[in-house]
Curated annotation (Swiss-Prot):
This protein's encoding gene: has1
Domain spans labelled Helicase ATP-binding: 171-347
One Pfam family matching this protein: CTE_SPB4
Organism in which the protein naturally occurs: Aspergillus fumigatus (strain ATCC MYA-4609 / CBS 101355 / FGSC A1100 / Af293)
Protein name: ATP-dependent RNA helicase has1
PANTHER family: RNA HELICASE
Amino acid sequence: MSGPVDTAKSITKKRKRKHGGGARAATETDDAITRPAIENGAVNDSPEKEEDTKKSEKNGKDKSAKKRKVSHASSDEGDESQEEQGAPAQADGDSDDNKDDGNDQSEAENGDNGDKKDTESTDLPSAGTLSLPTVEGEPQKFTELGLSEKTLKAINDMGFETMTEIQRRTIPPLLAGRDVLGAAKTGSGKTLSFLIPAVEMLSALRFKPRNGTGVIVVSPTRELALQIFGVARELCQYHSQTYGIVIGGANRRAEAEKLMKGVNLLIATPGRLLDHLQNTQGFVFKNLKTLVIDEADRILEVGFEDEMRQIVKILPSEERQTMLFSATQTTKVEDLARISLRPGPLYINVDHRKEHSTVEGLEQGYVICEADKRFLLLFSFLKRNLKKKIIVFFSSCNCVKYHAELLNYIDLPVLELHGKQKQQKRTNTFFEFCNAKQGTLICTDVAARGLDIPAVDWIIQFDPPDDPRDYIHRVGRTARGTNAKGRSLMFLQPSEVGFLKHLKEARVPVVEFEFPANKIVNVQSQLEKLIGQNYYLNKSAKEGYRSYLQAYASHSLRSVFDVHKLDLVKVAKGFGFSTPPRIDIQLGASLSRDKKQQQQGRRSYGSQPHSKGLKFKRKHDD
């Protein structure tokens, strides 16, 4: 038995001579990275412990004190020396994402000697032994929360000092370990509300990579997940805990490798998270202490209800704190809260006392515009506001693709963002627009939820939202934060003015804007000529036209957005056609009620007489 120990000792001595004081940290890091890969983690490393004990006894107190000095010095000097000496790789793969690896190693070195339980397996001490700061009253500033110095330094670097209302009311109970169901407007500061308590918990329990995942944040869209990840990166910059992101469209194998190395704070979209929970061997999540479900209503709206139920069922529920945030409270959200939260959660709603459902500082308007003038008005508006930062919302991916191709072709540069793009393209576009001082982004509702895009001047709703909730989330992309200003404009056709009544009931204040006819640039004839001559634009325009009609037919507010009231000739002109093109369109169940009307002699919009089933051929005129 003594032979192997001597060999290990001699190897360690050689490493020490070669690398200096960081050699032990490097070996410990290698051990920490590989450990979770072995059957979810329970590995006994007591022989290594005995070896360290013998070594320290043999070398005496002076040498161990000297060793601690070297370790602390290396952590104080900065990141570079640690990176050279084998500092642990950050979960997201960026070398600069963990700026305090040195502190991590010195903490691990000092902490391992005092807490054998932590090094012997992936298990953690019970959350019941956790002591997080308790706050009395309602604090106004982050410095009054009793947070760790590392967290406060990161918050200060981010430029925050005073808390928003949702932060004041949620962070103290979350630090106390309560389950919270929070409701707040978009742009109110929810992200820090759940990340600060999560990071404090990870730090207090001294999570290491080998302990696996302690916090999971579930987000409805990839872009929102990337945004939360960016905030987490800033918040964790002085902490030693690892963090990562798993989203659909990204490299699954690379994600699995990071999870096996150990990701303490994980941001994820539901589908990819469930995939890893079920199929990634070595993904340690038995130590999960906090589950955050952000934009819960949106997660359920986009069809992830089954996935969320499975995720909640798979994750350990004992000692788990759950935070569920939702801008709107629906029956489905209440059902999810019932299965995920512990009995007696704290319900926090910061909006119910407000006069309006949208943020202050937001000027909201609408314009009544015929279908054939909609594109001309949009073109004129964008031309006059080239120096502004604008987001334009459309109802379908094909509408976005067509208008992006058209506007870029006629030298009005725009960026596009929609669900049919590859993930890398979506990510690049999102960050390019975030960093831009001016420009136009045209997109579907994939960008309507939670995204914090700086300094947006105008939100244009070219196609109407499905309901007032979607309207609120769309306009929430501007006037974000304290004292911020922004403006929104919604295009409505004369047949759609009934939507204003629904907005009024939802406490959304809108006023009518007027655009003088002589200010609208009339490029209709040039547009029709271009669409008639350019094969690719013509094909794209047809797809956009077809998708627009499909989206319109599937509107939830059928009483307002009645597809039968559309003037197809005018709609077609808006897409650059002199006469409506002949297209095949599958409307599915959304028009099942129209079958009876057809049988009673009423033709569906633009359909040929005696058409069978739900396939309609468009005519030029009705």
